[in-house]
Amino acid sequence: MAGGCGRRRVVVCAVALGLSAAVLALTAVVLLRAYVLRSPAIPRLWARRGSTAAFSASERRELKEALRGAVRIPTVSLSSEDFNTTAMAEFGDYIRKAFPAVFSSKFIQHEIIGEYSHLFTVQGSDSEMMPYMLLAHMDVVPAPPEGWDFPPFSAAEHEGFIYGRGTLDNKNSAIGILQALEFLLRRNYRPRRSFYVGIGHDEEVFGQKGALKIAALLESRGVKLSFLLDEGSAILDGIIAGVKKPVALIAVTEKGLMTLNFTVEKEPGHSSFPPKETSIGILATAVSRLEQNPMRSLFGRGPELMTMEHLASEFNFPLNLIMSNLWLFSPIVSRVLAWKPSTNALIRTTTAVTMFNAGIKFNVIPPSARATVNFRIHSGEKAKEVLETVRNTVADDRVKIDVIEALDPLPISPWDDQTFGVHVFQRTILDTFPNVDSVVPGTCIGNTDSRHFTNVTNAIYRFNPVLLKSDDLPRIHGLNERISVESYEKQVEFLFQLIKNCDVDKLPEPHANSHEL
């Protein structure tokens, strides 16, 4: 008996020691990864220089007024067949007057594409260097004046801000690119590396007549791009919980899109003797099932994992330990991210019921009911998979489901120490924005014109070099869209320096202070 107890104690001690060793080993791994990830996943190849373009006072006034003039032109697009063609043509005339050096340069070719879009080919002095492209769009979403502090197309300047539709999406980029090029030309600067500038006129309605045709033209000419930079993410200040410093988030992919119509048809009748289920009730049940059963979390199957790991060193304890060890803590992080709509959108395909139409009179059983649901598809799945999940969730043959439009997510662009574009962005951001220490990859929630260019490059990046705070986000497509004059000056400075930085023909050796980023 005593011998048996002794053996049990030995076994218990051995198990306890084994568990202790496992816990210690796990703790060591967690701490080691937290230590290793203090340095960036991509080493800094450039020393921070701290200064870039020096614009004169008159140039700063000029760039501000050039943007204001463009914002005053109501280049609204409502649908692929309904947009303000008069304003689109006026925008073309406007940029010719605003940027005379660009339009008179002997090494810049300008073409009108799809009647209103613009393609500029800037011929560099070294034809051996692979070209790149800067992309933007002139069109804007509608802006009814109700609720605005200033008329949406007045470009009013108030307390250091320019108010107006397009100040953030996306005339700031369209005008900023041309402004930077104008300033470079005045300084007799000719780029070594060729590049293209594309300005679409129908991005807000999927770019079928603008960017799509520009991309097709480049492909027909055999053009291959080193990278393409379009609108998308930005420099986020105070938006990422737990991170105090501004973070430059560059989207390496964008979510897909699918819009479905749901229809239920039943015999109409009088409300005094209703059937057990009406068309409205059946459809309401189907829609409720979709809302109560969100798409599965795909955390870790898209760029969101890279985003967290690249930001790990910016978080305070204990978040830095958690973000450095997502191999262990990802289930917890995924659940936390699901709490808020803004972060939930990063980890799954989202479901949004946007339209519901039914009923003709208070005492009539309606013959039909219709709903529209919009899905933004995570990069870890395809539209076909989402449709199958929707059908299985609704599980009712009485509900007819029609696909209105479907776009798969774009491939994830390279983000590593061999990618030229990534290092050029890093260098330009760090020099232009001294308060930014982190340049990280991410996901663009919306859709951009860049999706049309996958046949000419696999390196597509989405970044609007402006500083955004939490209260700026609802202004995009919303009321009182605005940009600070200082932020726009920085955007032009970024683009000015980006063009110059792209003229290096190879990457330098890693900088000794790579741990700084």
From Swiss-Prot:
It catalyses: an N-acyl-L-amino acid + H2O = an L-alpha-amino acid + a carboxylate; an N-acyl-aromatic L-alpha-amino acid + H2O = an aromatic L-alpha-amino acid + a carboxylate; N-(5Z,8Z,11Z,14Z)-eicosatetraenoyl-glycine + H2O = (5Z,8Z,11Z,14Z)-eicosatetraenoate + glycine; N-hexadecanoyl-L-phenylalanine + H2O = hexadecanoate + L-phenylalanine. Its EC number is 3.5.1.114, 3.5.1.14. Binds 2 Zn(2+) ions per subunit. GO terms for cellular component: extracellular space. Zn(2+) 1 binds at D169, E204, H477. One of its GO terms (molecular function) is lyase activity. The active site is at D139, E203. The keyword Acetylation does not apply. Pathway: Amino-acid metabolism; Energy metabolism; electron transfer; Lipid metabolism; fatty acid metabolism. Its main location: secreted. GO terms for biological process: adaptive thermogenesis; amide biosynthetic process; amide catabolic process; amino acid metabolic process; energy homeostasis; fatty acid metabolic process; lipid metabolic process; proteolysis. Keywords: Glycoprotein, Hydrolase, Lipid metabolism, Lyase, Metal-binding, Protease, Secreted, Signal, Zinc. Residues 1-34 form the signal peptide. Lipoproteins are powerful coactivators of PM20D1 activity in vitro and NAA biosynthesis in vivo. Zn(2+) 2 binds at H137, D169, D230. Belongs to the peptidase M20A family. Secreted enzyme that regulates the endogenous N-fatty acyl amino acid (NAAs) tissue and circulating levels by functioning as a bidirectional NAA synthase/hydrolase. It condenses free fatty acids and free amino acids to generate NAAs and bidirectionally catalyzes the reverse hydrolysis reaction. Some of these NAAs stimulate oxidative metabolism via mitochondrial uncoupling, increasing energy expenditure in a UPC1-independent manner. Thereby, this secreted protein may indirectly regulate whole body energy expenditure. This is N-fatty-acyl-amino acid synthase/hydrolase PM20D1. The lineage of its organism: Eukaryota, Metazoa, Chordata, Craniata, Vertebrata. The gene is PM20D1.
